[in-house]
Amino acid sequence: SVVKSEDYTLQSYVDRRDYPLPDVAHVRHLSASQKALKEKEKASWSSLSMDEKVELYRIQFKESFAEMNRGSNEWKTVVGAAMFFIGFTAILIMLEKRYVYGPLPHTFDKEWVAMQTKRMLDLKVNPVDGLASKWDYEKKEWKK
C-alpha cells in the first residue's frame, strides 16, 4: 500500500511580485491537450505559435506581472462604505436635533452673551492678560 500525501501538505501556488517564480506550476492536473502542448514544448520553441506560448505560460503561471500590478477596484467599496456611514451619521444627528434635543438655553442668545461680557468687564475679570486687559475703560471700547 502506497501512502498518498494530502493536498495541504504539498507546496501551494501563489502569485507574488516579490517571489516571481513559484515552486509549483499553476495547473497541477493537465488535460490531454495541455499534455500534448507540453510534449510539443520539448522541441524547438520557434515552431510554437504565439497562442501556444501563451497557453504554456498560463499552465505555469496564473497571472503576468502586468496583471499582478493592476490596481484593484476595492477602493470604490471602501469609499462607498465610508460615504454610507457618514450619510447615516448625518441623518441620525439631524433626527436627534429635531426629536431628542430641546431648544438651546437662553444663555446662548447674542443679547445674553453681550450682557455677560459687559458684566465681566465691569467686574474687571482677569485684568492682567485676560478679557479686561483688552478693554479700554476710559474710552469704553476695545483696545487696538
Swiss-Prot record:
UniProt entry tagged with the keyword Phosphoprotein: yes
SUPFAM superfamilies given in the database record: Mitochondrial cytochrome c oxidase subunit IV
Subcellular localization: Mitochondrion inner membrane
Membrane topology category: Single-pass membrane protein
Record has Acetylation as a keyword: yes
Keyword terms, alphabetized: Acetylation, Membrane, Mitochondrion, Mitochondrion inner membrane, Phosphoprotein, Transmembrane, Transmembrane helix
GO biological process: mitochondrial electron transport, cytochrome c to oxygen
Mitochondrial intermembrane side: 100-144
Ranges annotated as spanning the membrane: 74-99
Topological domains annotated Mitochondrial matrix: 1-73
One GO cellular component, as annotated: mitochondrial inner membrane
Modification sites for N6-succinyllysine: K4, K35
Principal localisation: mitochondrion
Modified residues (N6-acetyllysine): K4, K35, K42
Domain of life, source organism: Eukaryota
Positions of post-translational Phosphoserine modification: S31, S33
UniProt pathway: Energy metabolism; oxidative phosphorylation
Sequence similarity: Belongs to the cytochrome c oxidase IV family.
Function: Component of the cytochrome c oxidase, the last enzyme in the mitochondrial electron transport chain which drives oxidative phosphorylation. The respiratory chain contains 3 multisubunit complexes succinate dehydrogenase (complex II, CII), ubiquinol-cytochrome c oxidoreductase (cytochrome b-c1 complex, complex III, CIII) and cytochrome c oxidase (complex IV, CIV), that cooperate to transfer electrons derived from NADH and succinate to molecular oxygen, creating an electrochemical gradient over the inner membrane that drives transmembrane transport and the ATP synthase.
Assembly and oligomerization: Component of the cytochrome c oxidase (complex IV, CIV), a multisubunit enzyme composed of 14 subunits. The complex is composed of a catalytic core of 3 subunits MT-CO1, MT-CO2 and MT-CO3, encoded in the mitochondrial DNA, and 11 supernumerary subunits COX4I, COX5A, COX5B, COX6A, COX6B, COX6C, COX7A, COX7B, COX7C, COX8 and NDUFA4, which are encoded in the nuclear genome.
Protein name: Cytochrome c oxidase subunit 4 isoform 1, mitochondrial
Organism, as annotated: Pithecia pithecia
Gene from which the chain derives: COX4I1
